[in-house]
Amino acid sequence: MPPPGKVPRKENLGLQCEWGSCSFVCSAMEEFCEHVTQHLQQHLQGSGEEEEEEEDLLEEEFSCLWRECGFCSPDNSADLIRHVYFHCYHTKLKQWGLQALQSQADLSPCILDFQSRNLIPDIPDHFLCLWEHCENSFDNPEWFYRHVEAHSQCCEYQVVGKDNNVVLCGWKGCTCTFKDRFKLREHLRSHTQEKVVACPTCGGMFANNTKFLDHIRRQSSLDQQHFQCSHCSKRFATERLLRDHMRNHVNHYKCPLCDMTCPLPSSLRNHMRFRHSEARPFKCDCCDYSCKNLIDLRKHLDTHSKEPAYSCDFENCTFSARSLYSIKSHYRKVHEGDSEPRYRCHVCDKCFTRGNNLTVHLRKKHQFKWPSGHPRFRYKEHEDGYMRLQLVRYESVELTQQLLRQPQEGSGLGASLNESSLQDIILETVPGEPGPQEEAEEEGGGGEGIALPASQGTSSPIIHVVNQTNAQGEREVVYYVLFEAPGEPPPASEPPSGGVMGELQGAAEEPEVQMV
C-alpha cells in the first residue's frame, strides 16, 4: 500500500530489518516498509503451501519472525500484519532515539534489559482515523500517522472574535482550537497515542524527546543524582525531575463522598471503587468468590491450586502455602523475631518489624486516629533508615480554593467541609527562604520542608491552612508558598483587595506553585 499524506522530513536513518536472519538496511521508511511487506507475503504464502497438520499450520502462519519478539496470533493473519508493520514504525522511533542520545554528550546509554527492545504493544484493531467525514483505516501505523498529520496541515484557519484566526480540531467529539497548525498537530497525538521516539536499548516509547531523555537520566548513578526530595528522600539527576516527582506528593483531588484527598485521578478512582462501591466485577470460576480488582482475584485463585504457590525464603525453612495470607501469617508467627525492626514510633521510639504492628501501637498506646477520609497511616523512611509516621500532607492551592468555594455555591458537599481538614485560612508574609541546594525545615510543622528558591530579600506570601485532623486528631499546619513568575514584580506583602479568596484565585493562575 503506498504511503498517503506528506513525506516526513529527511533523516539519516539506519533502518535495519530484523526479520529472521535478514540484514537489509536502508534510510527511507517507504523502502523499508516495502521490503518488510515482501517478507510478510512470502511468510504467509509459503506457510499455506506446506503440507502440515492444521494446528501446526496456524501456529507457523501467524508467528512473527522478528528477532527478540516471539509474537503469535491465534486468530488471523490481519493481527500479524499490523504487528509486523508496527515493528517497522518502532524501528524508526529507535533510530530517532539513538540520534537524540548521541546529541547528548553527557548521557550514558540505557542500562535496562536489551532483550525487551523489540517487544511492542498488542494491536487488536485497525488504526482508525476519526477526523470528521473520514474514518479511513490502516494496518501500518506509519501511514496512519502521516494521514492524520495531513489533516492538520490541510485544516483551514477560521475567524473567531476580532482578528483571531484559529484552527479547529476535527477529531470526533473534540472542540479544541489552536493558534496554528503545528499546535494542532501536537494535540492530535493525544487522540492517536502517537509516540515520536523510542529507546534504542530497551525499546520503550515516548511522546517527546524530553521524556525519553528523562528515562535515561533516571538511570544515573547515585553520585550524579544531586537533587533530593525532602519529603521521601529520593534522589534525581535534574531539578526538573525532582519537581515532577514532588507533584506526586501534593493532593489535587478530593473524594465527593468523604474527606479523602489524593494526588492522582487514578488514586481517586481506586478509592471510589474500594470505599464507596459495592460492585465486585471479578468473579472466581471455581467458587462463589468475587472481588473488586484483578490482583485480589489472582491471590484467591492461588488457594485453588494443587501445588503450593508460596514458599518461605528463610534459610533452612521448608514451609509452603497456597495463599499469600498463609505465608504472611507464617512469617509473622515464626520469623518475626529474625528480622531487623524497620518501623519506629516517633513518640516513644519503640521499634517493630512490620508497619501493621506500629499502626496498632499508635492507635492503642497513643490514641492516634487516621487522618479524616484516609483508611490508614503512611510511613516515611528517615535518614537513620527507620520508617516513621508521615506527619505532613500537602494539599494543592486549587483544591483549597475548591473546598472554600463549595459552601458559597450551596454545593451538596458543604456539609463535608465542616468535617474536612480545612478549618481556617490566614494570609501573612515571611522573609526569604534558602536556595534550592538547601533544605528548609519548618519548626513545629511536624516534618521536613521542600527546598525553595532564594527570594532575594523580598517577602513571599504564604497561606497557612490549619488542618483540624492530623494523625493525633489535633490541628496541624500546611504551608503554601506562592512564587512570582520569572521577570514579574514580586507579590505585594499585603493581602489583595479580594481578600484571601482573591489571593487563592491568583495562586491558581500562577505558572508555578510550590509547597513547604
UniProtKB/Swiss-Prot annotation:
Main localization of the protein described in the UniProt heading: nucleus
Region (Disordered): 429-456, 486-516
Annotated S-S bridges: none
Region Interaction with NPAT: start-end pairs: 371-516
Region spans: Required for activation of histone H4 transcription and contributes to DNA-binding: 372-405
Annotated keywords: Activator, DNA-binding, Metal-binding, Nucleus, Repeat, Repressor, Transcription, Transcription regulation, Ubl conjugation, Zinc, Zinc-finger
One function term, GO molecular function aspect: DNA-binding transcription factor activity, RNA polymerase II-specific
Gene3D superfamilies membership: Classic Zinc Finger
Compositionally biased intervals (Acidic residues): 436-445
Listed GO biological process terms: negative regulation of DNA-templated transcription; regulation of transcription by RNA polymerase II
UniProt PTM: Ubiquitinated. Ubiquitination may lead to proteasome-mediated degradation.
Span of zinc fingers (C2H2-type): 15-39, 127-151, 167-191, 197-219, 227-249, 253-276, 282-304, 310-335, 343-366
GO (cellular component) term, any one: nucleus
Subcellular compartments: Nucleus
Function: Transcriptional repressor that binds to the consensus sequence 5'-CGGACGTT-3' and to the RB1 promoter. Transcriptional activator that promotes histone H4 gene transcription at the G1/S phase transition in conjunction with NPAT. Also activates transcription of the ATM and PRKDC genes. Autoregulates its expression by associating with its own promoter.
Subunit structure: Binds MBD2 and a histone deacetylase complex. Interacts with NPAT.
Record's protein name: Histone H4 transcription factor
Gene: HINFP
